[in-house]
Amino acid sequence: VDLNTENDYVADYLVKCYGSFIKMGVDGFRIDTSGHISRLTFCKQFIPQFTALGKKYEDKRLNKAPFFMYGEVCARYSDVTYRGQDNLSCYYYTWEAPQDLLDKWDGSQKYWDTQVLFDKANGGTGVDDHQMALCESDNAPTPTSDNTFMVNGKWHEPDYSQASGFHVIDFPLHYNFGNAAAAYGLAKSGDKRYNDATYNVVYVDSHDYGPQQTNDQFRFSGDDAQWAENLSLMFTFRGIPCLYYGSEVGFRRGAPIDRGPHGPLSETGRAYFGGYLTGDVE
């Protein structure tokens, strides 16, 4: 389902639905496939509303911590900038969208009632003539930040004046966990691109992809020493460590992650059942 999240009616409905969980005391959202929604849409439609609800119902959370949101911007690439394009990169979503674009936003029902979106196969564009163009125009280079780093060996107050309030899964770091040295080197050189990389959610592998070795469609296939080094870095480095079920035991090492309709689940890296859960660590 491709929801029209640029329509206020749709966005408000989603906020109402998911806001119910915030009212119950849920302390954060992981938003799947966030890269399919523009940063402008997040900054206009969702982040402000969810943040406000989080503040309003903070007493429902046990520790009253700020409501936390992070998303999956799936950038399967070895560099922190995805194919040379800022607006397709994970870090882009951690920065606030330009105010001049936010001011031009019109998601009202009155606007959408004027739009007739014919399918491309029938000669139409398949998109509206304003909101889509507005989202695509949000492609300016991002600033850099020292929020992650100490300055002259000392802690300093971070500057969040340009932060979007949204955080991301650290896909570039995940992709470089073929070995810990590569992951560490990438973070040292690339963390300045995020508003604050200490809030990046870090995992070595997941149910979707393994770290880049020769093919990310397979579970990690290295030895125990290499795996232990990766996990040690994940738990002691900057960011929020995220352990996918099975990672701690080298689950289904080297297995293809997903065969789709071409083979049984038992032959994949997603065989989360029965004896498969014992893992392969000696």
Give each language-model segment a name:
Residues V1-M24, S34:
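Active-site-adjacent "subsite" loops/lids of carbohydrate-active enzymes
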Residues K16-G19, D27-D196, N200, Q217-A225, ...:
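Active-site-proximal helices and loops of the catalytic beta/alpha 8
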Residues V10, G210-P211, P256:
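A broad, structure-centric signal for solvent-exposed, well-ordered loop/edge residues
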Residues V1-E6, M24-G25, V204-Q217:
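Short glycine/proline-rich turn/loop motifs
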